[in-house]
Amino acid sequence: MIEVGTLVRYKSDGDIGLVMKVVEDCGHFVYWIKWGDGSYHSCASRWFEVIA
């Protein structure tokens, strides 16, 4: 599980975001991320990589 406060990079476009919330759903973790443009989106960890 990735922790709240972790910096991540979206794999497809390189956008940087900050993990704001972690929700467990049916045994899988969903991450709410605040992206560099100020938007919030949820996604699974396969769509981003941890950078710090």
Region locations from a protein language model:
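Basic/aromatic-rich interaction segments and small domains that mediate binding to polyanionic partners
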Residues: 3-52
